[in-house]
UniProtKB/Swiss-Prot annotation:
UniProt keyword annotation of Hydrolase present: yes
Gene name of this polypeptide: mutM
Name of the protein this chain belongs to: Formamidopyrimidine-DNA glycosylase
NCBIfam families: fpg, PRK01103.1
Assembly information from the UniProt record: Monomer.
Zn-finger region bounds: FPG-type: 238-272
Domain of life: Bacteria
Cofactor note: Binds 1 zinc ion per subunit.
Molecular function in Gene Ontology: 8-oxo-7,8-dihydroguanine DNA N-glycosylase activity; class I DNA-(apurinic or apyrimidinic site) endonuclease activity; damaged DNA binding; zinc ion binding
Keywords, sorted A to Z: DNA damage, DNA repair, DNA-binding, Glycosidase, Hydrolase, Lyase, Metal-binding, Multifunctional enzyme, Zinc, Zinc-finger
Binding site for DNA: 92, 111, 153
Family membership: Belongs to the FPG family.
Amino acid sequence: MPELPEVETLKNSLKDKLIELIIENVELKRDNLRYKLSPLLASEISNTNILDVRRRAKYLIIDFNNDYSLIVHLGMSGRFTLQPSNYETKKHDHVIFDLSNGEKLIFNDTRRFGMIYNFKTNFLEKELFNNLGVEPLSDSLTLEYLKSKLITRKIPIKNLIMDNRIIVGVGNIYASESLYLARIHPDKLGSNLRDDEIESLIKSIREVLAKAITAGGTTLKDFVNGDNKPGYFTQQLTVYGRERQNCLNCSSTIIKTKHSGRSTFYCRTCQYSEFT
C-alpha cells in the first residue's frame, strides 16, 4: 500500500502541472470503489479551477476555487496519472477528469481498494483528519511528543510507529527500514525506549522517508507517480524483503517475523535487545 513517500512523490509529480487548470468534466465509470462514490462528485468540481495539490498523511488533496477539495487514497493498487487527450480508456480506469489543457487525469484501480471523496475544504482538518498524528517530516515530531505517546505503551515499537494516530505515513516498509537504521529491535516495547533511542528513531524515520521521496517512492508492484513512472527506493532497501540474506552491516542473517499480520525484517545482531 502506498505510504507517505509514494503520495508525496505523486503530489510532486502533479502539483505544478495541475495548478490553475480547470476540471471541465468528470466521468464516473462505476459508482463505487472501496466505498460508494458521491453522485455529486461531478457537479461539485466540474468547471472549477485547481488551486493547490497537497498531501496529508497518505491522502492526496486537490483544492478547488469553490471551497471544495478532492481527497484521493490509492488503496492497494490505485494509480492517479496524467494522460494525453488521445488516451484510450483501459479496463480499470474508474474516474476520468477532463482538464482544460486537453489532458486527462485518470484514476485506475485494479483491486478497487482506493477511495475518492469530495468535501468542503474546511471540513478536512476539523473532522476528517482530526484524529491523525503528526507529520514525520515536520517540526511537530519531537522527543517530547513521541516520548509522551510511548511512555505507557507496552506494545512493540514497530506497531506504534505505524499507528497513524501517533505518526502518519510510516508504513510497513519504512518502519522496518527506520528501526534497522536506528538499531532498535522491532519487538522492543514503546515504554522501554530510552530518550536517546527515541531521538535516534526520529532521525532515522526522517532520513529513510527523505531518501525514499528522493528515489520516487517504493514500487513493489503497482505504484507509479503522476507521470506513470515507478519508484526506485526498492534498490536501497537494507532489510525489507531481504529474509535469509546477509545484513549489509554485520553479515548476520536478516530475520523475517510478523507484527499484527504484517511482515517485519530485522538484523538480530545490529538490533539486539536483552529485553523487549
